[in-house]
């Protein structure tokens, strides 16, 4: 009988963890980044690596910034090659995964649910 839940392999979880740590280090140092990200504190909420290990979906949440989500996405995408090169040096694999950034809507959804529950 097949499992209904999707589980991630040990390799996926390990690679996601390494990428998460590398992204945190890059954001903390501020090197190799688009200048718009210097005054834009970001939290990497999760990293999900595909089963073939070729794509890393990185979810972020900005705090206290004047930039819009689109501007942050543009700045992250402009820095993508430098970020990928940094990650490539951290992992010892034949191929480095393609990094894709996504805004994490989880916090917004939690606020909406809290407001709905409050209104009950």
UniProtKB/Swiss-Prot annotation:
SUPFAM superfamilies reported in the protein's UniProt record: Ribosome-binding factor A, RbfA (SSF89919)
Domain of life according to the entry: Bacteria
Keyword annotations: Cytoplasm, Ribosome biogenesis
GO biological process: maturation of SSU-rRNA
Protein localization: Cytoplasm
PROSITE patterns found in the cross-reference section: RBFA
Location (main, coarse): cytoplasm
Function in brief: One of several proteins that assist in the late maturation steps of the functional core of the 30S ribosomal subunit. Associates with free 30S ribosomal subunits (but not with 30S subunits that are part of 70S ribosomes or polysomes). Required for efficient processing of 16S rRNA. May interact with the 5'-terminal helix region of 16S rRNA.
Subunit structure and binding partners: Monomer. Binds 30S ribosomal subunits, but not 50S ribosomal subunits or 70S ribosomes.
HAMAP family linked to this entry: RbfA (MF_00003)
UniProt-recorded name of the protein: Ribosome-binding factor A
Gene: rbfA
């Amino acid at each position: 009988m097949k499992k209904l839940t999707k589980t991630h392999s040990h390799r996926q979880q390990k690679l996601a963890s390494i990428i998460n740590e590398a992204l945190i280090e890059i954001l903390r140092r501020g090197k190799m980044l688009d200048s718009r990200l210097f005054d834009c504190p970001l939290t990497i909420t999760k990293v999900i690596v595909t089963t073939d290990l070729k794509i890393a979906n990185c979810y972020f949440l900005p705090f206290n910034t004047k930039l819009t989500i689109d501007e942050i996405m543009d700045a992250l995408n402009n820095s993508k090659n430098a970020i990928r090169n940094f990650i490539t040096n951290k992992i010892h694999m034949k191929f480095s995964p393609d990094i894709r950034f996504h805004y994490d809507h989880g916090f917004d959804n939690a606020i909406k649910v809290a407001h709905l529950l409050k209104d009950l």
